[in-house]
């Protein structure tokens, strides 16, 4: 992955002492963004994105524009169809609907002892751990990324990456060195369940409202009738999460949705317009399964009513 234009990081630095590659698996905006930031930090990055996307990434590349910078940075990706050599890090950044297909590129014997960061919004990742090994870490991206063809946009403030410590967490933490000079704010969490729901609750509510009304979340917050639904839906989601013994603080989750950047669109909104249903299935399955475990009648919830309307839109 070689930048064709000036990158966002100008500080002079030595290349990483560990020259093993970082593999980033996926074909979405998060894949491109993480690959670009890790390249800016001097790492050898290889993207696994499937036949068509591999060709596009390696020949046409992508451009990255961040609200926090006036620069437009261009990148071409080194690509592969599978993990060929022992990496120092593997990142699974694929959308929920593409995770299973992307796992065909990984194998325990190739990954070795390298940590695997899994950014998927899927709640249950046990089957992924069985495929990649016990050094799997849940990770969550708190930022607003959008992709339009070969253009990737980061809206709003500098994003944050939350990495959840796994049961094999060792005192020697490899991530500070890997993410140094990327410009990302990296935090480490011990409560994976809480971290998941603090990510998923605003993601689900923002996705459902914007998709149903075919409006960006920013526009929804300017409409009082629609805006007033946000606290109620967050509260419903928090009640479902309580089935796992978790008490979510709803106020910061509501504020997060109120502060969405003007141009940001949740993936579900675009997917419905294209006739897809992967995101709807993801959100529905997480909420329904968690509600069942919490012994909550999900069928009577406002969340379920919105989901039904969204499926009707998809089927039209």
Walk through the language-model features, giving the residues of each.
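Helix-loop-beta segment of a Rossmann-like dinucleotide-binding subdomain
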Residues: 151-162, 214-221, 265-274
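Active-site-proximal catalytic alpha-helix in oxidoreductases
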Residues: 193-221, 225-238
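Rossmann-like NAD(P)(H) cofactor-binding subdomain of soluble oxidoreductases
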Residues: 69-152
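NAD(P)-dependent Rossmann-like dehydrogenase/reductase catalytic/cofactor-binding core
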Residues: 3-6, 45, 231-316
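Rossmann-fold dinucleotide-binding core
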Residues: 122-199
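A structural signal for isolated positions on well-ordered beta-strands in alpha/beta enzyme cores
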Residues: 23, 46-47, 117, 137, ...
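NAD(P)+-binding Rossmann beta1-loop-alpha1 motif at the extreme N-terminus of oxidoreductases
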Residues: 6-72
């Amino acid at each position: 992955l070689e930048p064709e234009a000036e990158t966002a990081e100008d500080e002079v630095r030595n290349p990483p002492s560990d020259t093993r590659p970082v593999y980033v698996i996926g074909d979405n905006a998060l894949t491109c963004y993480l690959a670009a930031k890790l390249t800016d930090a001097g790492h050898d990055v290889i993207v696994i994105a499937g036949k068509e996307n591999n060709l596009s990434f390696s020949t046409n590349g992508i451009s990255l524009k961040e609200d926090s910078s006036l620069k437009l940075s261009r990148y071409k990706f080194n690509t592969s169809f599978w993990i060929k050599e022992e990496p120092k890090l593997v990142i699974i950044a694929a959308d929920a609907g593409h995770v299973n297909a992307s796992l065909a590129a990984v194998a325990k014997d190739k990954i070795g002892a390298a940590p695997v960061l899994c950014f998927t919004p899927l709640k249950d990742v046990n089957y992924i751990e069985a495929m990649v090994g016990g050094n799997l870490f849940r990770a969550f991206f708190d930022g607003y990324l959008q992709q339009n063809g070969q253009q990737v946009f980061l809206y709003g403030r500098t994003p944050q990456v939350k990495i959840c410590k796994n049961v094999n967490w060792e005192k020697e933490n490899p991530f500070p060195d890997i993410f140094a000079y990327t410009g990302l704010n990296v935090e480490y969490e011990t409560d994976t369940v809480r971290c998941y729901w603090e990510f998923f609750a605003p993601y689900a509510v923002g996705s459902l409202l914007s998709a149903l009304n075919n409006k960006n979340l920013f526009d929804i917050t300017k409409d009082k009738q629609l805006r007033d639904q946000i606290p109620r839906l967050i509260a419903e989601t928090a009640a479902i999460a309580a089935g796992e013994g978790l008490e979510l603080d709803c106020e910061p989750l509501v504020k997060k949705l109120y502060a969405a950047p003007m141009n940001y669109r949740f993936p579900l909104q675009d997917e419905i317009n294209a006739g897809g249903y992967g995101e709807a299935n993801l959100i529905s399955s997480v909420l329904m399964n968690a509600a069942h475990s919490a012994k909550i009648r999900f069928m009577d919830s406002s969340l379920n009513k919105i989901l039904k309307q969204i499926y009707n839109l998809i089927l039209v």
